[in-house]
From Swiss-Prot:
GO terms for cellular component: Golgi apparatus; Golgi membrane. Pfam families: TPT. The keyword Flavoprotein does not apply. The chain crosses the membrane at residues 7-27, 31-51, 75-95, 100-120, 132-152, 154-174, 194-214, 224-244, 250-270, 280-300. InterPro entries: Sugar_P_trans_dom (IPR004853), TPT_transporter (IPR050186). GO terms for molecular function: antiporter activity; UDP-xylose transmembrane transporter activity. This is UDP-xylose transporter 2. The gene is UXT2. It is found in: Golgi apparatus membrane. It is a multi-pass membrane protein. GO terms for biological process: UDP-xylose transmembrane transport. Residues 327-353 have a biased composition (Polar residues).
Amino acid sequence: MSDAQKFQLGTIGALSLSVVSSVSIVICNKALISTLGFTFATTLTSWHLLVTFCSLHVALWMKFFEHKPFDPRAVLGFGVLNGISIGLLNLSLGFNSVGFYQMTKLAIIPCTVVLETIFFRKMFSRKIQFSLVILLLGVGIATVTDLQLNMLGSVLSLLAVITTCVAQIMTNTIQKKYKVSSTQLLYQSCPYQAITLFVTGPFLDGLLTNQNVFAFKYTSQVVFFIVLSCLISVSVNFSTFLVIGKTSPVTYQVLGHLKTCLVLAFGYLLLKDAFSWRNILGILVAVIGMVLYSYYCTLETQQKATETSTQLPQMDENEKDPLVSAENGSGLISDNGVQKQDPVWNSNKDFQA
């Protein structure tokens, strides 16, 4: 099996793990929040991250992966930013209607595209842009209902979108810049994410629910679903970093909308949730957008691989392996065969707020 085939197989595995684990945790949390009344989402997320860190620490002790320290300021900034983005998304849901919150989630893809284009000079073809528009249109039809606006909610949503986009772009960029795996990055950033949410979680949850997480009555059922949710979250967090590292932040967001469609379909088929022809139409349009996005991405990847292979014989002996050169951070081959620098985050500048 060639390296390219191994990479494709690993990517498919990461995408599959992300879908299965994310849908599973949504089902578990739906039972915990809707049925059992445990509405403390931010605090629950901090517990997820603590369990994830403990699990990775055990895996490190068993030598399943190697600890690779790198720029501590980069880790701190990245971890805190991730924690803030999660808190802002929860606040956005609390201070906005469900419809406006769904619009907030839809805005993440175009915002990511704009940021990557401006700061990383990454080009998205017309075909890719077209498929993303179809996808967002479908998800919008299926999920967006009322659009009640208020100033505080709008500001929180804007901040949530920006921090989420930057955090996901950094997830991809840091792995490439410091040559760390998704597991190594998750292990080092998890404590900072967990501490950020553990400190702010009870306050945010109290603000949104008017309840105290520590005064909640923890029955055996509640404890069971909390433990189950935390265990599933290990797979969710791991697959998130894995997918973004192997693909891109935009692809991860496309995958996120696939999960939304699957959750809607699950709710209708098994839980008998209310479903309309609008939901069905939206899901079908979204699926068409996802298929087009996957097809165009695969097509462009194959075209670039073909162009690179035809250029290799024409290069000097010192330039025979551009992929290794790119991996070492020395440059990338652009579409016209000219070598260009790969822009990276400047830890001294980009992690100081």
